[in-house]
Amino acid sequence: LLSAREFDLVITMARVGEMDVKAFGTEAKLVIEGLPVVMLSHNTRELATLSAGDGIDRIFVWTGDSRILLSICKLIEDERNVENDVRDGDVQVILLVEDSRRFYSAYLPLLYTQLVNQTTRLMGEGGNLHEKLLRLRARAKILLASDMNSAKSVIDRYHNNIIGIFTDGKFPNQGGQRDTAGLELVRYAQEGHRYMPILFQSKNLELK
């Protein structure tokens, strides 16, 4: 199939016949250069042993909510289009910083649903179908970062267009403390943008 036609995204389960899923992802990327390959799993044991990389771009958890499929498509679309849309259309950006696969797999469908509903309400009844589609495409883009370096990279690149940051209290922090990574990121984001809206989420009461 990959050789016969063009694909924009591959979503695969952890088991692809007898082939290892990472080997499958690598093979797919050899057929179509730059093809995003996302793995979807519901097996807790599998999730504990698998990591992104080597053919797999992201890993999501299947919880029974079918909206995760649309959210994966929208996230990959946002990641691919954000640079051009910010440059050409001054589109806004929302940053989600979370390394828990189970949490961001549950969070993203909620976030995208609210974002699309709000955009639809703002459009109202006016305008033709073409105008409404253009407005939907101009909705805020959501970017997912799972460690400190990638979060800072998004802030550095799109700080003028970020309208909000949702951050966990703990996540991988290269060269720093994992337990206080969220607070470090908040300080970093507000250094040049004091009033940037940030929602800090943590189960650790000591960080509140």
Regions from the PLM with identified roles:
Residues 199-200, 208:
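In a subset of proteins, long, contiguous C-terminal domains/tails are tracked
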Residues 1, 6-37, 41-49, 56, ...:
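Conserved phosphotransfer microenvironments
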Residues 1-3, 52-58, 62-141, 148-149, ...:
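Non-catalytic signal-transmission and effector/linker regions of two-component phosphorelay proteins
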